[in-house]
From Swiss-Prot:
Pfam families: Rho_N. This is Uncharacterized 18.2 kDa protein. GO terms for biological process: DNA-templated transcription termination.
Amino acid sequence: MQENAMEAANWALTIFFYGLSWFIAVGSIMILWPVWEYLKKKAHEQKLKGEEIIVAQAMTEQKLTIDFLREEAAVKELERLKAESLEIKERNAVEIDGIDYQGLTTIELKAKAKELGITGISRRSKNQLIEDIKQALIEQAVETENVVLNDDAHAHAVASV
């Protein structure tokens, strides 16, 4: 009978320890599983935040590049418009006083140049005289425009007082 009691106690302890180990294993899984899921979620959120920061930095760099390119394009467009305006002024300089300078003789061109105050006209060719006359007419037009603008500014200043 003692043998049976020892064998029964042995089986009871074996079953108890197997049960205890299963209880610990299942309990650990039940406790650690939510902790594991929480840690995975936090790691994923941190990864997303890092990606958001990288994307935001890249977008900032792209925005700066786009702004720089737009400014460069605006500067080039402004330069092109200035050059075009100057070219139009040069082409239309002949029309300022309504005379076709290509049809005039060299003597008539020299007289017009002298009238405009151009010096050193005796050694110049017909085309050089035409260019000098155009340049003088452009300068006169610019000076006249500046005088008108200054008079307008002066009139506005007097009117505001």
